[in-house]
């Protein structure tokens, strides 16, 4: 998945905190912008009601944020593999590429990305034989700066680790009355003193990248399948 550096957002689950409160912006949001952001955020309760393997595998990892996008139509049998194909085919905007490039540059300068996942810290070793057998992609396959743990038809889980965070991204696709809903769940484990300032620093960029990414997927979905397919 693109954007690994910006995947960990800041929103702790009830009773879970890294010891600080996310600063509140004093800027008055434009009504359209505000509505877009609101519609792309899901309550943790809605996400946690889904029947996902990630809930058990990451039961001791804080869930920090859930983003959603509704995908109308699509027909029967759409899967995470379709979402990955659409995401790969839809090129990020110039702004997104600039932000990704800035993060890669800072990672090289400060050595953030020289830290790799130790086998004993990865959830890869916790996968069951059934997980490994049912995964459509070999568990442990590198995908950009992530390690793919599994990909099922309705769910995929990826893991990343650097000097700033140990994070997980769960993508889930659930059928709805009008099509499908894509969920993008983010989990974060603090790894050092850098985690806290890093998460604060990337929050403005994340507010740009996440909605843009989900809108890009939705446009690609509509182009591929149409709203009434």
Mark where each language-model region is.
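A short acidic/glycine-rich loop-to-helix N-cap element
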Residues: 188-209
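Hydrophobic-ligand binding "helix-grip"
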Residues: 133-176
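Short acidic, glycine/tyrosine-flanked loop/strand segments centered on an H-E-D-like triad
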Residues: 172-194
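Hydrophobic ligand-binding cavity/cleft-lining segments
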Residues: 33-132
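Short, highly charged C-terminal tails/helix-capping segments
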Residues: 218-229
């Amino acid at each position: 998945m693109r954007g690994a550096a910006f995947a960990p957002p800041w929103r702790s689950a009830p009773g879970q905190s890294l010891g600080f409160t996310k600063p509140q912006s004093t800027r008055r949001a434009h009504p359209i912008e505000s509505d877009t952001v609101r519609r792309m955020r899901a309550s943790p309760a809605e996400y946690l009601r889904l029947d996902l393997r990630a809930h058990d595998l990451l039961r001791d990892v804080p869930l920090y944020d859930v983003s959603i996008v509704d995908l109308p139509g699509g027909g029967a049998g759409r899967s995470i593999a379709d979402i990955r194909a659409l995401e790969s085919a839809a090129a990020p905007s110039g702004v997104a590429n600039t932000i990704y490039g800035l993060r890669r540059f800072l990672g090289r300068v400060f050595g953030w990305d020289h830290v790799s996942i130790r086998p004993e810290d990865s959830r890869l070793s916790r996968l069951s034989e059934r997980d490994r057998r049912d995964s459509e992609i070999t568990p442990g396959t590198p995908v950009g700066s992530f390690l793919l743990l599994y990909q099922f038809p309705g769910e995929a889980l990826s893991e990343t680790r650097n000097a700033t965070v140990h994070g997980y991204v769960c993508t889930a696709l659930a059928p709805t009355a009008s099509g499908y809903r894509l969920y993008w769940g983010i989990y974060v484990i603090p790894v050092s003193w850098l985690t806290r300032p890093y998460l604060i620093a990337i929050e403005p960029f994340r507010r740009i990248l996440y909605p843009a990414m989900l809108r890009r997927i939705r446009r690609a979905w509509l182009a591929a399948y149409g709203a009434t397919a």
